[in-house]
């Protein structure tokens, strides 16, 4: 193949390769990760209802949860860098150095990797990390070795937790000064002295005079729960340790053992499930103790040796799930500061018998739930004048009168759920003017009159529930913000005029039948933002909803519908201009017309951002179902069987939402869905979850559980459409680019093409030096010929070491006799590695010198990196007289100019400089 044709072929091949790489890059990038889920809790907080993943923390939104992790680096490589919550589950014995350095925004890290070793630089770069958890959920503890300085770089760490790990082989671990919560649950602690070995900065020296260590962390909470070998605390084991909270749930350690431990300033102590049988009196030594949790123990009597332990600073006391049957007289007198008392799940029934002396001016919260109470006697709570919350759920109370609640004028929350209440007596809330929250779920009420809810002036949250039917009569409280109504059979609103719920923001209805009487009356919800409907299909019919919601819901943002039966649903969304989240569950769309129904349902809510579809029996999906959802950011399919993905859904890929989840979805085995795999793994802007483990079935009786991707790889042609698209795209792009390169108006494109051509020329492996006959072409005029031949040429052509040994091309010497000078000049300059122009006033006046300078300038611009131009000034000249001087000034470097005028440079120095520049030009050309 001729040389010119070979160069053109290489150039075209270069274009094809570059375009192929660009195309593969554009279509191949994705952040879909096997066994990982990426979620934005700010976008859809209810996602965990459909897909379980690790818990987050308040204020954190972008979450990544990965399971079956074996290669940590490979898994983390595709997790978004701005992840705030990262949960990892799998098998990674050793955490390498800088394992999480990419995640500068990470604030919560939960590791369930069965890790046995952590290096000193594992967590380097996590300056924002606040929560760090090491979890091992197994009956036996796992040994974990921690380098002493492994947490040194975590300057913002506030919570550190170890669950199911033994730190036996670790010691002298540095804890950041920002640490506030330390947890060692279900570990191998046998005594408190182990803490001093593990974390010496926590404890002061055991000398009699405590010296606070500068920079030591100040713990608010120390959780040592379920350390089954921790049975006693030795003398001064915790000497000098200052804590707000100490949690010892599930340990055999008795509270009495803490007396001589040296623990200072304890505010909260939890001894849940420790097996104690009486309220410890020895803790009164902690005069600042404010909270004590003694739940799930064996306490039958609060009395101890006939006296009640006195906790003068105690504000919270929990005795839930014990065996209490009575409360001693003057019980609250010994707790003058008590504000919250939890006595739930005891045996204080059937009648609440409170001692006559039981009163408190500070008690604000009282929980008497699940105590088998049948009645609250008149005035039983009248002495609790400051009570704000009263919890009586799960008892057997059948009725309450205003005398039962007399004296509770500060009460704000009243919970009477899951009782046997059948009738509400008139005025029973008359003594509760401050009530804002009332819970009557799970009762046996048959009707509720609005007049029965009178008394509270600012009732905002109301929950009503009945097993059979529930009739609701006006007037309802005008200040309601949240209303939840449940009835097993029917909810019936009996109204006489279109009285609106002016301020209601959250409405939940759960029933089989929803009725509104009289039929021609409507209810208005102008402020409704969240609507939840649960029940049988006919409650969701268009006719029912239009009667109940006849006008627009202008502020509705979240609509949740969950059906309880398998009948078809006739549903139509209307008048919801601000709907952002739509959740549909168990609405049986018949597969024959499923696409049409879903399309009709969604076309009225084009502003939708989150769409969750569960148990809908969709059977078939096509692009027409979602083409109206331009703002969709999250799409979830849950529990669908034999789902067919129409191939025209590929048209929807450019506007596919940012998150697409498939949870427990079974597809049909058909090649029409072959595009799913390439889309799921190469989706440029979409995270896809659940497809890699989805199965497909050939028919209704197929139980083979064939993986969808395995079926597509085995039975369907792979990638034919993609490569066809890629080929046509490249050809079309070539037809566009090639004319532009030759267009004179697009000179920058021509220069870019030249640069690519040069790089490819070198990549093709050409030995450029072998293609040149001369090292330097010298351009000069006749007046300067004598100086060139006598002074310049001998220095450059002389053999080393005296000279450089360059091959020079001189027009007067090397042009063939009888050859055309123009052709010889063009050919010679093209075969020379560099061009040296000797410039004087006579040279600038010479047509041939000007022509040679122009030709050399052209080669310099058209072939950058492969040709060089050197200018030698023998006399002072105005450089503006040079042809295309401004272009030359951009392309030439400082070392490309040589000035011998007026003896500015010594001859020897000039020769050395010229030799070095010519030698460097030769190396660059090679």
Curated annotation (Swiss-Prot):
Residues 1-30 form the signal peptide. LRR repeats lie at residues 240-263, 264-286, 288-309, 313-334, 337-358, 362-383, 386-407, 410-433, 434-455, 458-479. One of its GO terms (cellular component) is membrane. One of its GO terms (biological process) is inflammatory response. InterPro entries: Leu-rich_rpt (IPR001611), Leu-rich_rpt_typical-subtyp (IPR003591), LRR_dom_sf (IPR032675), TIR_dom (IPR000157), Toll_tir_struct_dom_sf (IPR035897). It is a single-pass type I membrane protein. Residues 772-922 form the TIR domain. Disulfide bonds: none annotated. Residues 743-926 are cytoplasmic. Residues 31-721 are extracellular. The keyword Signal applies. GO terms for molecular function: NAD+ nucleosidase activity, cyclic ADP-ribose generating. The chain crosses the membrane at residues 722-742. Its main location: membrane. Glycans are attached at residues 46, 73, 342, 396, 402, 506, 520, 620, 699. Keywords: Glycoprotein, Immunity, Inflammatory response, Innate immunity, Leucine-rich repeat, Membrane, NAD, Receptor, Repeat, Signal, Transmembrane, Transmembrane helix. SUPFAM superfamilies: L domain-like, Toll/Interleukin receptor TIR domain. It is found in: Membrane. Belongs to the Toll-like receptor family. Binds MYD88 via their respective TIR domains. Interacts with HSP90B1; this interaction is required for proper folding in the endoplasmic reticulum. Participates in the innate immune response to microbial agents. Acts via MYD88 and TRAF6, leading to NF-kappa-B activation, cytokine secretion and the inflammatory response. PANTHER family: TOLL-LIKE RECEPTOR, TOLL-LIKE RECEPTOR 11. This is Toll-like receptor 11.
